[in-house]
Design a protein with these regions (language model features):
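Short His/Asp/Glu-rich catalytic/ion-coordination signatures at enzyme active sites or charged loops
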Residues: 1-8, 132-138
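Small-residue-rich helix-loop
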Residues: 5-111
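Charged substrate- and nucleic-acid-binding regions of tRNA-handling and nucleotidyl-transfer enzymes
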Residues: 98-163
Length: 164
């Protein structure tokens, strides 16, 4: 693990590329941005494909991922957060890290909740995983606007199905 952390970003990126290619087929994904997120979070290069596969395809996941004691999230408040995040993000003209961050942090203020109560559900909807390299802002930036909104919509539908 130490060896990987000592590499420059370019060196790491070069070594990581063949592993990305195993699970990321979408040419519009900026692999260099993934390298920046991943380098400090990878012990061995062969772990890479399973850490990044969700960028290409959202895995099947259960709504229990939205329930997190420490983050103070449950199915109800996650649904509300996703609905509001969808509304706000869909209005964004410039899809940049800063714009996404400002939008979601303003939403946190507006809803008067903890950061995690908006960011955990969004990150979960975008990755479909318990843990991911990077949080809501990074993932949204890399996935792009259409895919981000699409995945949030899927999260909303999953959560709505459990409320009946």
């Amino acid at each position: 693990g130490e060896y990987i952390k000592k590499l420059s970003l370019d060196e790491f990126h070069e070594k990581a590329l063949p592993y990305y290619k195993q699970s990321i087929k979408n040419p519009s994904i900026d692999l260099k941005k993934i390298s920046a997120l991943l380098q400090s979070r990878v012990e061995i290069l062969s772990d890479i494909p399973e850490k990044v596969d969700f960028f290409d395809n959202l895995p099947e996941y259960g709504v229990e991922l939205y329930v997190h004691k420490k983050m103070k999230t449950n199915e109800e408040n996650s649904l509300l957060a996703l609905e509001k995040a969808y509304e706000k993000l869909s209005l964004l003209e410039n899809w940049t890290f800063n714009e996404i961050e400002n939008t979601l942090m303003n939403l946190v203020k507006e809803m008067e909740v903890k950061n995690s109560q908006v960011l955990w559900p969004v990150r979960t909807a975008l990755s479909g995983k318990q843990s991911s390299p990077g949080g809501a802002f990074e993932l949204a930036e890399i996935l792009g606007k259409d895919e981000t909104l699409n995945r949030i919509k899927i999260g909303i539908a999953k959560l709505k199905n459990t409320q009946n």
